[in-house]
Each structure stands twice: as structure tokens, then as C-alpha cells.
Amino acid sequence: MGFFSFIQEIAMDLGTANTIIISDDKIVVDEPSVVALDRRTDKMIAVGEKAKMMYEKTHDNIRTIRPLRDGVIADFTACEQMMRGLIKMVHTGSRLFSPSLRMVIGVPSGSTEVELRAVRDSAEHADGRDVYLIFEPMAAAIGIGIDVEAPEGNMIVDIGGGSTEIAVISLGGIVSNNSIRTAGDDLTAEIQEYMSRQHHVKVSERMAERIKIHVGSALTDLGEEAPEDFIVHGPNRITALPMEVPVCYQEIAHCLDKTVAKIENAVLSALENTPPELYADIVKNGIWLSGGGALLRGLDKRLTDKINIPFHIAEDPLHSVAKGAGIALKNVDRFSFLMR
């Protein structure tokens, strides 16, 4: 970028769990959506991974906040500070001025006008001059490599931290969609609750997240792909003495069953509302899974068996939305589905 380039273009997947920023076709920021603030002054102390390291470990003068809940902004001021801090990471090197930003930001397809306004306002307060919004399933489809402008139906199931976005896309628009606030965070909360109830061990959100990554599963029989048991360390919730509990994937699959069933039902509900011609395309093309939730072991197989339509996991599910927003950034004049 030259010295006289005053406009910087960035694409952002503003997620409940992680925020990803793309600039010049490269992922330049991939950080947890967490910010640490000084309680006395409300000044930002840390953002992203550094703030996450402080999460659940702070004293009275520091508060760590996850500004997004269920895919939407829950704390406007904290979100603005977090966006500003993460955008600063893109501007490496010394500069006499901050460039004005052209931004494309992914938002849940079930967002209300108020929620969309909150994202736009946060972006503008964080120096966004030209702000476009794109619905996350549309961005995910573009990121996966689907021709969203074709006269053909494609279904995307994007399972993030805070929401699951299901959309049927054709001719550059969303034909039918279903957005539910059941997603990765709910799986983590289920594990926390299960460990407390079943094993009497208190686990933090971060430990529950690690359990999900190591032994999380949507199926009780993974065959050859079964992971090894995971050892959980934590205090006994009754005696407060330290405990060591081995956890296997089968018990986590049982514990996550109800939450996964909610996602199944949401997909079925979206299919019910799909016009027959597009339904035929979806049966032929299969359904695409993106977002961190797509990485839950056995989820694609469970959904395929239940719904009788093949489910494919996107090549890079964690970054599909960000990559799609990055492509949209290069086509703001062409893509009529971008919201200004």
C-alpha cells in the first residue's frame, strides 16, 4: 500500500467467539472476541488473546468482557473498543495518521434493524468511513467458493459461537433462512453443567472449551476416528479438593445430544420452507457446514443420516465467513446484496 493511500480496505467476521480481519486478501487478525478494561477509567488494557488469558482470572480493578452474545452486540462500548484495538493490529508500523476504512462486516441473518445499526455504529466509531454489512451465511457461501449469483439453490449451515445461521441462497439473495441462538457457546455451557452434575467437578468456560475440542462429538460411535480420553483437573464442587477426571467422547456426545438436536431441527425447518425447485438443487449439491461448530466430530455424518442429504464440511470452516467478506470487499459495486 503506497504512502498516499488514505483508504484502507478490511473485511471482518465479528464473531461471538473470535474476530477475524482480512486485509489485502490475507488473514491479518484472528483473535478471541474479548476485551479487558480498567474499571476505574474504562480504558482498554488488552484485547484478543491477551485479554482472553485474563478471562475469569481478574481482580476488582479489571473486567474482561465478551462484547457479543448470541451473535449480536451485547455491550456496545466494549465492542467499539475491541474493534478499535483489533483494527490497530492491522496498522502495523508507524503512521502519522489513521487511514479511513472501507469495511465489509459479517452479521447474523436473523439480526433485527437495531442489531444491524449497533454493528454499523460500532464500526463507524472505530474509524469506519464506508461500512457495508453482509449476512454471514451469504459470506460463508462466497468463502466456500459457491457461485451465489447462479440460478441454483445452495444451503449453508454456519455454526458460530453464538448463533447458527441456516440459509438457502440463489440468484444473489437469501430465499429462506433460519437463525437460532443455539451454537458453540451452548455446547460449552452444556459440558460445564454436565461435569458439575455428573462428576462434581467445577470447570471454567475455558476448560469446558478444551474438553469440547479434545473429546467433543455428535455421535456416540466414531469407530476408528475416536479420540483418546481427556483428563480434566479441577476442584470438587462439594469439598473443594483437587480432582482428576478422565472424560471419554461417548459421554460428551450424550451430554451434547439435546443441543445438536436443536440444530438438526432448525435445518429441517429451513428445508420445509424451501421452494421445491431449490430443494431439488440442495439434494443434488448437498448442504455445506461452516463455522467452528462444523468441526464437532461426527456432526456431518449425524446430519447426513438424519436428513438424508449429504453434508459437506467447508475446507476452512473457521474462516469461511471472513474469506467471503474479503471477496465481497473487492466486489462492493457488483454485489447488490451488501447492505449500506
Task: Describe the residue ranges of each PLM region.
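Nucleotide/phosphate-binding catalytic cleft detector across ATP-hydrolyzing
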Residues: 1-159, 167-287, 294-340
